[in-house]
């Protein structure tokens, strides 16, 4: 599935380009949020980082999948995570929100994980 590939590409990009290791842990999302914040502060145009943001969102989705047993859902070219209690989450859109200064992949993962535990 595409999001799994996008997530793997983000891991490689972060390791090779930024020398940051991502291990699919919830804690690693702090590094991803910080990287997105740095890119935004540099004034990079959205179009120049759209693919990277998609990869970061897919990576966050994979973290949620691995933490909660969720699965990827696709419809019309859009991808979401469906957690076991039936809730849908959009980590790719959350990465875009992070770039706009209004989101957090780390907090999205925390909320999704907490929702499953309730």
Predicted regions mapped to residue ranges:
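Generic helix-packing signal
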Residues: 11-14, 65, 116
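A sequence-level detector of short, solvent-exposed, charge-rich linear segments
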Residues: 26-29, 51-55, 83, 114, ...
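Amphipathic, interaction-prone secondary-structure segments
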Residues: 43-85
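A recognition module on extended beta-rich or small alphabeta surfaces enriched in W/G with H and D/E
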Residues: 81-118
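N-terminal low-complexity, intrinsically disordered segments
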Residues: 1-50
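A residue-identity detector for tryptophan
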Residues: 6, 30, 72-73, 80, ...
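Generic structural signal for hydrophobic core residues of well-folded globular domains
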Residues: 36-39, 67-68, 99, 112
């Amino acid at each position: 599935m595409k999001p799994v590939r996008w997530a793997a590409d983000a891991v490689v990009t972060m390791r090779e380009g930024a020398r940051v290791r991502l291990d699919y842990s919830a804690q690693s999302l702090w590094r991803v949020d910080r990287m997105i914040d740095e890119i935004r502060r540099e004034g990079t145009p959205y179009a120049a980082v759209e693919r990277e943001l998609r990869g970061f969102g897919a990576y966050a989705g994979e973290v949620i999948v691995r933490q909660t047993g969720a699965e990827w859902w696709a419809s019309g070219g859009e991808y979401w995570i469906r957690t076991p209690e039936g809730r849908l989450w959009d980590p790719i859109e959350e990465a875009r929100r992070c770039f706009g200064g209004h989101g957090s992949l780390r907090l999205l993962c925390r909320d999704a994980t907490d929702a499953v535990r309730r």
